[in-house]
Amino acid sequence: MQGTLIRHLGKHVDEEVSIQGWLYNKRSSGKIQFLIVRDGTGLVQGVLVKKEAPEIFELAKELTQESAIRLRGIVREEPRSMGGYELTVTGLEIINLAQEYPISHKEHGVDFLMDRRHLWMRTPRQNAILRIRAEIEQAARDFFNQNDFTLVDSPIITPAACEGTTTLFELDYHGEKAYLSQSGQLYNEASAMAVGRMYCFGPTFRAEKSKTRRHLMEFWMIEAEAAFFDFEDNMKLQEEMVYFIVQRVLERRRQDLELLGRDISKLEAIKLPFPRLSYTEAVELLKSKGEAFEWGEDFGAPHETIISENFESPVFIHRYPTEIKAFYMKPDPEDGRVVLGADLIAPEGYGEMIGGGQRIDDLQLLEQRLEEHKLPKEAFEWYLDLRRYGSVPHSGFGLGLERTVAWICKLDHVRETIPYPRMLYRVYP
């Protein structure tokens, strides 16, 4: 049977309701017991007075942390309680009496908690992160749908690398080599030639032997590709999407942000349009800060942090040197040394959150780039077909969901941004 959700208790003040959930915590003053119950939508305190319900009072003494229960009671307004309401308990049913719970309310080490990630997710903090992640995903879907983009799923098993990297998870696909996708981008370009504007959500995999706070082996990308979009159109789309997401989270998940201790003013300070720095300007900025950095090098995490510290909003770095970007990036017609690619760097030191750019639409140039990058042309014949049959200017990007969640929630590590993180040397549970 369904009960009333805790988040809806405000609609039932002075009414008797039934809620279902798990015992998060309890305390007693001898004659009164306080049962803190969670149901995934919030927490509520149930109050049990011994003299008013002695049998229920005794039954409640048996309850252990995370026991599944059904509570019946009268909803009362109580500003001092979590959520502003509490329940005067009139009935209690134990659905399942939990065994001794391994995660207590004291501090635990990260490895201990990661080994019990399937249980750690039940805490209010982890609940809040998961809800914010879900809100970000829903906001992105709403944004794309409002802008006439079509959801087109891309494959996870692919015959070739998207960018020719060595960080691939290789598979034996019925005797042939195949790989777990690092990006749906090449397929997204094909989809854009079919539907005009497309987006997709999907897991991506990179076998990077990295243990930084920004890296996972398996992570989710929100990707988009649009025919007839040039470089500037692409950056405008990105900033509007990120702004839309931030505003949606502020509107609908403020309480979760507050639970996490997030400085909400940092998110409220974000304005459109986002600042733009050319790669060359970013290099000069780093040098002015005393960094030994040469034109042609790629930015590392410390460099991105230094750059981001100069801006309240995310900042675009655009027109990177050709040598450090992917083979499909379109050269800048005004400067052949650089490509029409841009990264969006998150504020507060969270690094690159979006990578994107305008794609090469000329067949001969794309064939030349494949050769320069020593990529097998035969594996990309289908991709070259896109330039043979009705090629048009087109652009796209990919947003790293976990890094975006980490920034919006201001988390120390991306491992908390995904239900079951896959990191170097960790694939359990």
Swiss-Prot record:
CC annotations in GO: cytoplasm
Keywords for this protein: Aminoacyl-tRNA synthetase, ATP-binding, Cytoplasm, Ligase, Nucleotide-binding, Protein biosynthesis
CDD domains for the chain: AsnRS_cyto_like_N, AsxRS_core
Keyword Oxidoreductase: no
Gene Ontology biological-process entries: asparaginyl-tRNA aminoacylation
Family: Belongs to the class-II aminoacyl-tRNA synthetase family.
Protein's UniProt name: Asparagine--tRNA ligase
Gene symbol of the encoding locus: asnS
